[in-house]
Structures are given as structure tokens and as C-alpha cells.
Amino acid sequence: MKISLRKSRDSGTVAPTRRRKWNWKTISIAGAIIAVLLLLFVLFQPRSLPRMGDAAMPDFGVSTSPGAIKGTVALASSTQLSAARQEVAGLERVAATDVLELFVNKSTAEAAVIDLRSAAVWWTNPQDRDQDGMASPLIKGKLGAQLSLTYLMPNGQTKDYDSFNDSVIHKTFTIQSEPDGMTVVYEFGNPERGAEAIPLKISKQRLEEKILNKLDQKDRNQMLTRFRLNEDTGIYERREIPKSALKKVLDLIEKAGYNEEDLKSDNEQNGVVEGEGGGSASFTVPLRYKLDGEHLLVSVDASAIKSQPTYRLHTLDVLSSFGAAGKKENGYLFVPDGSGSLIYFNNGKNYAQGLVLPVYGEDPSFFKTEQLNTYETVRMPIYGMKRGTSSFLAVIEDGDAMSTLYADVSGRQHEYNWIGPQFTVLPKDKVMLNAREELIKTPAEPYAEQLQIRYMFQNREEAGYSGMANAYRDYLMRKYQLKPLREQADKPADAPFYVEAIGSISKVKTFLGVSYDSPVPLTTFDEAGQMVKELAARGVFNIQMNYAGWMNGGIQHKLPNNVKAVRELGGRDGLNRLREQLQAQGGTLYPEFSLGRVYNDDGWNATKDSVQSLGRISLKFFRFNAANFKKNVEAFSHSLLSPALYPTVMSRYLEHAELLADDGVSVQDSGSEIYSNFNLNEPILRQKSIAFVSKALKQAADRGKVMLQGGNAYVLPYASQIIRAPMQSNRFQITDEMIPFYSMVMHGLIPYAGEAFNGVENQDVNKRMLQAVETGSNVFFSWLAASTEQLRDTMWDDFFAAEYSQWLDEAASAYRQLNELHHKVGDAFMIKHERLADEVVQTTYSNGMRVIVNYGNAPVQVGGAAVEAANYRIEEGSK
């Protein structure tokens, strides 16, 4: 189905006329006509949506730091602590709390943290890297770096520096002590003089006066060969100097007494900016360490980074080697791809690609012509590592939307298992000039705010991914003041049953040979009410209905400048009847709309209001062909609205939705997608978009209940319900085990469900139910009432398995079983998850309940009792 954007109105042209004599009457009439034409032009010109000012992150009223020490602290034995301090002998202690001590090596800038509760020592860099038989000297140096960066050359190519090879060995770093930590300031680049010390441009008079007249004839001739005279300007311009001759020319410059003051004067006189004269790139980057109670904070103030105009900082890796574990260590890396995965140390999977995971997924504002894989998104900006009986969880607190996680195992370039983030300080993209030529483009300004990582440490029985999940849940509760379900007085007794009702789509029809879009009702409001009745008759309660395609033209709706329920579905009265029916059953109606995705050009100015790429093109997105992975330009999907307009659009939607009396709102895209806007008039980097999303969602949450999809971490303070949360990982080759980390964090905080049971590749309801038992998620189906014959000749093949009459009985059966489990653990925290065998897992809850799931085809014995094949068992326990 092809959807064409209606073009903006044209103001027209005026045909040439013959000269004539004008009188006052003619002038008056002409003036009136012009005024009318101008009025019509203003009325029908596409208007840019009004902005609602800048956006700042909401204040959640957090009174204590997330790192504040909780309860009584049990320290390690004096013997253990003595051994730990012996390990850091020769280092200087720079800060301490009741549970952590921070040390620094003043010769190498390496840092170490001692956890006094276990005597575990966490190093920023592996201490035995010199014994690595696989690593080259350069790689050993990189293992000793706390920071690594890439920068852009004038031609768009990238080069890299690391803090060991390009700062520490040159002794161009300083350590500044602070009450709660320290800041290490690195000067990147070769401190020795290079071509930049030779003037790029110099007047004939000054070349003779400052250099040539102070040299003998032989040296003067040598120097003159390095410049060419521009006869038009009378300026000498430096030639390219080969490396073999550079030292000789520098010696002559020094011999003549030409100094930095002279160079600065010549540069200013001839318009040469710093760095334009060549030489090595140089950067100044401050890295701050701070102890915050139980946690270590590591940050870089991007606004304090200094660079040359010629060389621009592109990416920055922060503590990639923190905790790096060697070949003799036991443990794993935790990566948050989708539900979560573990990578066992030294797993030998060097045939597999190392892990590269953009936090919150890829930025859709970048140029893309094909889509090879659709993968589970990183919803939480976290990563971790378990070593022996200790572990850490790292939370990317600031700069999370600009970050990408990297992880790999030993055996590729060196003998260490490692994980860490890379921050894209200055995004770049390819812009095609023609079929063969491309140009690298960047925004005018880089990201200039904080980049911050918070390290949380776990020990003994809390060490591992279960302890990491408990720590992150506690962190979210403190940061966002989230109230557990068990403390919410109005929480329902029954488990939620999530159903997505598909309302109206558009279908191309013809009349007298003219094509037009016609609304096709798939589920009317009354038919959705019938779904509710039939579910209730089968023992399904607490129905949470996400109603998609209910307004302004259906699924691909117009912007909510005005909100009208689709007449073919039953209009406003039908919608309100459905809402009242759901409320009477103890459920909630969530009419869905898209905040950022725009499906047609009504109600906005596509030039001013849409997201632009770095090539200054207003982006349009198309569906991809599943056969060849290429973009299908005949299948338009959507455009993107500038994030700056989110609060305006939300305000308008809520204003009109109030008239429809709905008590919930479902936002289709904001919980799962975040992007930049490179519009020159209003550039917005991805990190700033989070503030606009938060401002808009807070408006909705202040008014009532909010259902979101995907569940990115920054939307959690505003979510009442989450659907399409990640229930599985990507199963990348390098990973070894899939874990329900997302669920472990969320259970007991916000009710959630994964993908619709009938919307996944494997539609075995029993298997989906078993996965829901393991992950603590709820039943979710995406349904329509009409026959799927209505979907023929449309792009909506996603809905071919959605006829609700075919799923009712299985859905109700799955719900009744999960509701029984919900009554036992629905508001409890999921405090432990473990794999007992290949296809047997056990989940433990904060109220002592345990749930064992057997995915296998044969019964298994656990704790002296059988768990039947493809089944589960609930065990009572003590808290």
C-alpha cells in the first residue's frame, strides 16, 4: 500500500502584464485583492507547531544519593583487608567511605577501589598485562589506558589515541586531589614539536626579518625551498614537508629564534586557526573519580574537553578495562541485550564477533539503506561483571543515549575478558553527493554535558546477575521515587490481561479510476466490548486494553491537533461505552497514539517540524523488504517529529482526549525509540531528546494512567503499564546464557508483558505461558474482530494471526494459570534467578515463594519432587 504525502499549497505565480496607467480606484482594488491573497496564503500555509520552551529533566525529589550506605555494614576480616591493601602497596589513597577506598598510581594514573565488605580489589586496568603473551606492545599500552578516543581528520577519516600511549608515557597528565576523590587531566598528543611549529602562512617581510636574516646562505636556501610565494598576496605559504626533512626545518626555525609568540602573531595576521598548521592532534580530557557511599562515580565533563578546530573529538571510551579478567579467572560478563545475556569468561568463541550494543538501539536519524537484522534493544543503560565471589554493576547515568556498549572475551587481541562503554561525543554520518561520492558530516557542536558511570559492587551471595538486578531495582526506586506495588493501596487483586484491539486501517480503493484511501474498521468499539464480555465469561479480569487505530484516520493517524474517534468504529459515544464497560469490569482503556511518528502531512510543517539528517534532509521511513533487506520505497511508513515538539503534541492530545473522558493514555513510540534531530535551526542531540520525552510523559502521568511500549529506562517514572517489554535476548553467538534481567528489575514495581502471544514466531501458547511464569510477565494478545480477509492488498500482514475468536479459549486458560501465580507473587520482588539444568530454571521471590519451570520434554526431580515436562511448580518458602 502506497501512502503519498499531500504537498504543501503553492502560493502561485503572477503572469506578466502589459504596462498600463494606474488610478487610485485600481490601486485600491488591487490592494484589496493582494490582502485577500495574503490572508489565504497565511491560512493555508503549513504551519510549524509551536514550541513549549526548552526541556529539563523533571525533579523527582530525591533526598538521598543512590549510593547512600544502607543499614549496618559488615566488613571483611582484618587479614583479608591487610591482603587487599598489600595488593595496592605503592599507591596513594585519595578518598574513602565506610565501605570503599580509592587509590591511585601517580606514575600511570591507574586507580584501584577496595571494597571493605569483601576485601575485593577492582582495578581500572589489568595489573599483569605485561605477561600477556598474545598482546602486542601497542595493545598492552591500550590495556593500561583509562580513556581511549577517536577523532576526525579534516578529510573525514578517523584516528585514535589512548591515555597510556598518548599521554601517560609522555608524562602529560596531572592528578588533582579532591575531598571525595580525584580528577586526572590527560593531555593527549605528542608533546614534541611538529609541523605546526612552522608557520603555514607568513608575509615576505616577516619571513626575511624573523627567519631568513638570522641564517647563513645555505640554511636560507634550505628554508626557502619549504615555502612558495603567492605573487597575488605577497604571502609565503608552507609546502608539504616530508617527515625525513621535518626535523631539519624545525632545527632551523629554532636556530633563527622563531618562537611561539612569533607563530601566534603570524597565524593571527594571516587568518590561520589553531591546528590548521598541521602537526599532531591534541586534546585535554578530565576524568573524575568520586566515592559516593557504596558506589564509585566516574565522569567526564564533556564541556571541559579541549581540542583544536582542525581535529574534532568523535568518540570517547571510558574505563573499558575496568575489572578486566584474565584467562585463569572464573566469572562472566553481563550484557543488557533485550532481557539480558551472560558471556562466560574465556568461552573460546573468537570465531564470533565481539559485542557492539547501542544503548536504546540505533539512532534512526542516521542514513540507512538496508536492514539486515531486527534485534532486541538495550532498554537499560547498564552492564556488569562477576569475578569469583564479587561483582559490579555499572549504570550509565549521564550520556546514556550517546553510548554504545562493547564487550569481548579473551583470545582475540589479548588474554582478557572486558566490557565498557563508548560515548559518541560528536556524531557523524555519510552524506551521498552522487552515486559514487560521499561526504562525512557532523553537527556544528559536540555533546557538551556530563558523561557519568556509577559502579555498584556486590559480594558473596549477592555477587552475580541476581544481585546486580536487586541493586539496580533499588537504584531506580531511589532515583525516581518509585513505589513498589505492595505499597500501592489501589493495586488490583488479579493479574492484568493485556489485549491490543486493532481499530481501523486505511485501504486503497478506486472510484472512476481515481485511487483514494478508505478507512477499514477491523474492530469497532462495540466489538471490542464483546471481546471484554467473552473474556469475562471465561474468568479473565483486570483487562488492560490498548486500543490502536481509534482516532484521526486509524493506525496511521494524523497529528492530534484535533482528536476525533473514527466514525466507522462507533465514534465518541462508542468509545465512551467501551471505557465504561472496562471500568465496570475492573479494567482500563488506553487509547493509543504516536507522539513522535507522523504518518501524513496534515497538521504540521514537514520542513520545519520534522527530523532532519546530517545531510539536511527531512527523513522519511519506509518498510524494508524481508527478501533482500532493502528499503521498499513503495511502502512509506512514517516521518519523525522533532522531539522539541513532544510537549506541545502531548498537551494538545490530552486537551482533546479530556473531552472523550478516557482515563488512560497509551503512547505507541516514546517508550521504545529515541532519536536526534540535525535541523540547523534547532539541533537536538539524542541525549537532549530524553528531556523532551520526559516532559511530555510527565504531562500524561500527572493526568492519569500511562501505558508504554518497550520500556526504556528513562520512561519508567511515568509508566503505569508496559507492553512489549524484552522477554528474550538476541542470542548472539558470543553469548552463553539468556537471563530475564529486565523482568528481575521490574517485577513488583510496574506490571508488564512481553510481545503479544500471537505476534511472535513461535505461537505455542503453552510455551509462551511457561516463559511468562519464568519472567513474571503477563498474558498479552493483539486482536481484531474482522476477518483477516480485510487485510488483503494492504501492508498490514503483521495482523494475519490476530482474529480473536481463534484465540479466546487458549488465552483464557493461560490467564487463569498465571492469575493463580499472580495471587502468590504478583507484588513481590524477583530476588533470585538460577539455571538448575539446561532447560530448568528457578525463580525466587522476596516473599519466599519459589517457581521452578521445566521447558524440557521429560519430568525432572528438583528438591525431591517432580516437575512435569513442559510445566512448572510453585513452592512455598520462608522470607
Language model features with spans:
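Aromatic-lined carbohydrate-binding/catalytic grooves of carbohydrate-active enzymes
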Residues: 492-648
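Solvent-exposed loop/turn segments at secondary-structure junctions
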Residues: 109-110, 119, 190-192, 304-306, ...
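Conserved, mostly hydrophobic/aromatic
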Residues: 99, 300, 535, 582, ...
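Short acidic catalytic loops
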Residues: 297-298, 541-551, 589-595, 656-679
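N-terminal Lys/Arg-rich, disordered targeting/topogenic segments
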Residues: 1-23
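An active-site-proximal structural segment forming one wall of the substrate-binding cleft
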Residues: 471-482, 524-534, 641-666
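Active-site-proximal substrate-binding groove within the catalytic cores of carbohydrate-active enzymes
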Residues: 44, 104, 109-116, 377, ...
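N-terminal accessory beta-strand-rich subdomains and adjacent acidic, glycine-rich linkers
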Residues: 25-31, 40-485, 864, 868
